[in-house]
Amino acid sequence: MAEAIEKVADKVADLVVDDKPAAVPESTSDHEDGDDNDDAVNEGEAVDGEKKKKKKKNKKKKKKGPAVQTEPPTVPIDRFFTSGIFPEGEICEHPHKTFKPKGTAVDPFADSEDEREAAEERAKDDAKHGSDDPLDFNRLRTTNEEKRYLDREQAAVHNEWRKGAEIHRVVRKYARDNIKAGMTMTSIAEMIEDSVRALSNEEDSLKGGQGFPTGVSLNHCAAHYTPNAGDKIVLKEDDVLKVDFGVHVNGKIIDSAFTHVQNDKWQGLLDAVKAATETGIREAGIDVRLGDIGEAIQETMESHEVEVDGKVYQVKSIRNLNGHNIAPYEIHGGKSVPIVKSADMTKMEEGETFAIETFGSTGRGYVVTDGECSHYAKNVGVGHVPLRVNKAKQLLATIDKNFGTLPFCRRYLDRLGEEKYLLALKNLVQSGVVQDYPPLVDQKGCQTAQYEHTIYLRPTCKEILSRGDDY
């Protein structure tokens, strides 16, 4: 009974507690005088302040629209690719190399002893690696997982090439649309170079910018002409202008060129050279011999004739000009791609980058140096050379800081504030530290044209980095 009574008493006590009014929570104010009005006012102000702050935060910021390029191009290319990923060039398969069966006969109709010897070596090499069943080795590159892995490992390198190529496409589109008769060579070159610098947006010229001086070679001058200070040459209506400029990103140089005409007078020459360049690109690939590419280029080039003012001209490959491989900070990496038939059995290799360029001429098809020099480059691998002329030492320091082994021209030195440097520059050339590259010309009165693309031999494919909608 006692336990039952205690339970009833506990329930009654609980009911009494529940009937009491709810306790007022203690003030959290710092005031100890119990001034509730002040607290209410302060709380009201705080609430109002919070509302105001919330209103400010809730204001929607205007979304920035997509970046728009200016004319001339001045907006850095990175603003158009905020992910940092740049578009691929044109992707092609490597040429399908089918080895000859063992015992393949040597061509008995080779034109010279050198060519016969080269053919014999080629036959021996093919016989060594060949089999009774033709096998397309390069086709396997696109399905070999190891090659795909190697390709992915180089993604960052590919992206730097592609950034330079994108800058090149934007700048050359503007140049092609705006080069007009009456412009000076200086204004054309600077229009291109200013845009390259703006789109690269690099304070350090060794991290990105101009890959080499802009070539603006006219008519019978095929290459290596850019204006020096005071140049007054003006583009005329019937001129044939070769525009050759480069863009580099961390030493990876995109080298691409086109030929500009104001009318159709020499269009047949341009068509021949463009077709020859496309042949070179098509034939290029891993394990392809450079001499074979040259032979194919020459065959395409010299299948064309041009009729101008009632006279027919045979288009010729300029036999002492070549394409070349490109190494980091080195426009000519050591391998040459001939544009005529050659006994050169050197092969293209995986991972190499090449500038496939062809030059056609209505003249001799052979160039010599002539005229005032403007192009220079520090020789690769040159060691310490004792220089006695202080000005030469100072000039070399400027070259090292701003160009390294990238080509430069006298206008670039002028732009850096160098003065009275010609004797010092001559001293560097004579000392073997710097190489000069004078203009290259065919016979006067003829016309020359050029087209060029940069290609990269990836493990799985061939990428035409500089390909665009224009060429």
UniProtKB/Swiss-Prot annotation:
Binding-site residues for substrate, renumbered to this chain: 224, 332
EC number: 3.4.11.18
UniProt keyword annotations, A-Z: Aminopeptidase, Cytoplasm, Hydrolase, Metal-binding, Protease
Sequence ranges of Acidic residues compositional bias: 32-47
Annotated compartments: Cytoplasm
Biased composition, class Basic and acidic residues, residue ranges: 119-139
Residue ranges of the region described as Disordered: 16-80, 92-139
Cofactor(s) the record lists: Co(2+); Zn(2+); Mn(2+); Fe(2+)
Main localization of the protein described in the UniProt heading: cytoplasm
Gene3D superfamilies the UniProt entry points to: Creatinase/methionine aminopeptidase superfamily, Winged helix-like DNA-binding domain superfamily/Winged helix DNA-binding domain
Family matches, as InterPro entries: Creatinase/aminopeptidase-like (IPR036005), Met_Aminopeptidase_Type2 (IPR050247), Pept_M24 (IPR000994), Pept_M24_MAP (IPR001714), Pept_M24A_MAP2 (IPR002468), Pept_M24A_MAP2_BS (IPR018349), WH-like_DNA-bd_sf (IPR036388), WH_DNA-bd_sf (IPR036390)
GO cellular component: cytoplasm
Positions of a divalent metal cation 2 binding: 255, 324, 357, 452
UniProt-listed CDD domains: MetAP2
Enzyme type, top EC level: hydrolase
Cofactor annotation comment: Binds 2 divalent metal cations per subunit. Has a high-affinity and a low affinity metal-binding site. The true nature of the physiological cofactor is under debate. The enzyme is active with cobalt, zinc, manganese or divalent iron ions. Most likely, methionine aminopeptidases function as mononuclear Fe(2+)-metalloproteases under physiological conditions, and the catalytically relevant metal-binding site has been assigned to the histidine-containing high-affinity site.
Molecular function GO terms recorded: aminopeptidase activity; initiator methionyl aminopeptidase activity; metal ion binding; metalloaminopeptidase activity; metalloexopeptidase activity
Biological-process GO terms, alphabetical: protein maturation; proteolysis
Annotated positions binding a divalent metal cation 1: 244, 255, 452
Chain intervals with Basic residues compositional bias: 52-65
Chain's role: Cotranslationally removes the N-terminal methionine from nascent proteins. The N-terminal methionine is often cleaved when the second residue in the primary sequence is small and uncharged (Met-Ala-, Cys, Gly, Pro, Ser, Thr, or Val).
Family the UniProt entry places it in: Belongs to the peptidase M24A family. Methionine aminopeptidase eukaryotic type 2 subfamily.
HAMAP family linked: MetAP_2_euk
NCBIfam families recorded: met_pdase_II (TIGR00501)
Descriptive protein name: Methionine aminopeptidase 2
Organism, scientific name: Yarrowia lipolytica (strain CLIB 122 / E 150)
Organism lineage string: Eukaryota, Fungi, Dikarya, Ascomycota, Saccharomycotina
